[in-house]
Amino acid sequence: MKLTWLGHSGFRLEIEQAVILIDPWLSGNPMFPEDRRDEAIQGATHILLTHGHGDHTGDTLSIARELKIPVVGIYDLINTWQTHQGIEGLGFNKGGTVDLGGAKVTMVNASHSSSFDGNEGPVYAGHESGYMIAGEGHVIYVSGDTDIMADMQWMGEYHQPDIGILCAGGHFTMDMDRAAWAARKYFDFKTVIPCHYKTFPLLAQDAEVLKAGLPGVQVIEPEVMQPIPL
């Protein structure tokens, strides 16, 4: 298994027989070196979206067309894009599980909002979501954009993820302190990786706060396009 941060909330996850691009915002992302785009998307088999906001959907449509790969996510958004954008898609909903190249991906709840820009303003894009991704002896919790929520209790007990990819930039999502509290209260992670931070001054956060709040947990500060040891 190999995980690479693409900046902001974007990741490239190589697991089982799948290469999954999660929330691939590359073009215009101040953290991502655009001359490494081809390297970032090479061999991708699926695109997995947590919600419809532009800093998460990003390059989804262009990559899906270029590589002829399916976009996976909440049914409402995927169905809209299949109808109006002509892409291949796999839409499902919370509680559902899909098999992506041998990795079992279950959609779970998040607490945020979800829309994309239309000609006359924001367009509803279905509910925001997170994911539990099981494969190669691990379960990875991808929080998507969220705050602390009570659902995390049963999500932790039922899915028992050992790796957490947690939004922690504050302002639009939980910050480092809240992410640490959620991880400590509801999960038993061995490894935690923060994301959705440092992209803009508004999202400036100190990962040392997360580390201090999670004694005994390996907290990895990701570097863009540097494989993360798991």
UniProtKB/Swiss-Prot annotation:
Keywords: Hydrolase
GO MF terms held by the record: hydrolase activity
Gene3D superfamilies per UniProt: Ribonuclease Z/Hydroxyacylglutathione hydrolase-like
Pfam family, one: Lactamase_B_2
Domain of life according to the entry: Bacteria
InterPro entries per the UniProt record, alphabetical: Metallo-B-lactamas, RibonucZ/Hydroxyglut_hydro, UPF0173, UPF0173_UPF0282_UlaG_hydrolase
Family: Belongs to the UPF0173 family.
HAMAP family cross-referenced by the UniProt entry: UPF0173 (MF_00457)
Name of the protein in question: UPF0173 metal-dependent hydrolase Pden_0574
Classification lineage: Bacteria, Pseudomonadati, Pseudomonadota, Alphaproteobacteria, Rhodobacterales
